[in-house]
Regions:
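Extended catalytic/binding region for NAD+/ADP-ribose chemistry, centered on the ART fold
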Residues: 32-64
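Active-site and NAD+-binding cores of ADP-ribose-processing enzymes
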Residues: 1-27, 62-196
Length: 196
């Protein structure tokens, strides 16, 4: 178990709590999204910009040997910064946290074909860990980064405040942030036309 403090978090994907849970094997399922409706909605976040890029831009992309970022990876996406209203407890499912849970890190870092299994495992962890409002896990696209999946639960529900929101391609500020991280952290570059 670890604490996540009320600082800026970068959102990478979400599934509103008002929608039913996705079935196992759904083509758009995330690695840990809950399979049990009682856990509420969820939000994938990173506590660094590099983590948000790894999960929100590079997730499931085939990267060429030339290291070129494709335009579709960047369009129709926003960088959203939120803040937790108060500290929350999350289950750590990497490093010694995974060892304490008798988990094989190969399972937790597997590809999309293993997401049904990781979803079931993550749901079991959250159902048995009542104080946890999510899980912190190793990022698949960067060994030195971790990401979080936060859940809403009920009584008391998780509370977030919107801090900032910017389009990562059409807004120059967002584009500069994302392209800068792609270059410095991942040694990737976008070579296509840029909007005005």
């Amino acid at each position: 178990m670890s604490k996540s403090s009320p600082k800026g978090l970068c959102c990478t994907a979400s599934w509103p709590p008002t929608r039913p849970t996705r079935p196992l094997g759904h083509p758009k399922q995330g690695r840990f999204e809950p399979t049990h409706a009682g856990l509420g909605g969820y939000l994938y976040v990173a506590d660094t910009l590099a983590g948000a890029v790894a999960e929100g831009v590079l997730r499931n992309q085939t990267i060429s040997k030339a290291g070129v970022v494709r335009r579709p990876w960047l369009v129709n996406k926003k960088l959203v910064r939120v803040s937790l209203v108060s500290d929350v407890t999350v289950a750590s499912v990497y490093g010694s946290g995974a060892t304490k849970l008798n988990l094989d890190s190969a399972l937790l870092c597997g590809g999309v074909s293993q997401y049904s299994q990781t979803r079931e495992t993550g749901t079991k962890i959250l159902l048995k860990t009542k104080p946890a409002f999510g899980m912190r896990y190793r990022c698949r696209n960067h060994d030195n980064l971790t990401s979080l999946m936060l859940i809403t639960r009920k009584d008391p529900a998780l509370s977030l405040t919107l801090v900032d929101e910017v389009d990562i391609f059409f807004d120059k500020r967002g584009r500069d942030l994302i392209l800068g991280v792609l270059h410095t952290e991942f040694q990737l570059q976008y070579t296509g036309l840029l909007p005005n």
